[in-house]
Regions:
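Alpha-helical segment proximal to the catalytic Tyr-Lys
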Residues: 31-35
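Short, flexible catalytic-loop segment of classical short-chain dehydrogenase/reductase
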Residues: 45-55, 59-63
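Active-site loop immediately N-terminal to the catalytic Tyr-X3-Lys motif
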Residues: 9-13
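Rossmann-like NAD(H)/NADP(H) cofactor-binding core
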Residues: 36-41
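Residue(s) in the substrate-gating loop at a strand-loop-helix junction
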Residues: 2
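C-terminal helical subdomain
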Residues: 42, 64-100
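Conserved catalytic-site region of short-chain dehydrogenase/reductase
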Residues: 5-7
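Active-site helix of classical SDR
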Residues: 18
Length: 124
């Protein structure tokens, strides 16, 4: 589930909404299944360098997707699963942590975030 599950992404309403739903379902499943010894970890990576990401690079509505320092590589997500999710079984892993924190803050303060996003997206 990408970082779009943590904060609304202007221009990608349906995509963002579907990711919010998957994250919510996964977190609840993890909570409910824990009593049965079943772990569910939701992995929320930032943009990952894949062919799907390449298709978005020229689309204006995807500007926030490319606002980070760099796209993650697939191996970074794999490492998070192998080194953290399978060993520690947290409910959620966010990659990278700093962008995840920013996304969560944007979700907590949507009016402020909307103003900031509007400014940063329009300043190309």
């Amino acid at each position: 589930v990408p970082l779009a599950a943590l904060a609304p992404v202007p221009g990608l309403a349906l995509y963002s909404a579907s990711k919010f739903a998957v994250r919510g379902y996964s977190l609840v499943a993890g909570m409910e299944l824990a009593e049965h010894g079943i772990a569910v970890t939701t992995i929320c990576p930032d943009a990952v360098q894949t062919p799907m990401l390449d298709q978005q690079k020229d689309k204006e509505q995807a500007a926030l997707t490319f606002s980070g320092a760099r796209a993650l590589i697939v191996q970074e997500v794999v490492d998070a699963i192998l080194d953290n999710a399978l060993k520690n079984k947290p409910l959620e892993i966010i990659l990278p942590t700093m962008r995840g924190g920013i996304a969560k803050a944007a979700n907590a303060f949507p009016t402020i975030a909307a103003r900031q996003v509007g400014c940063s997206v329009n300043k190309k």
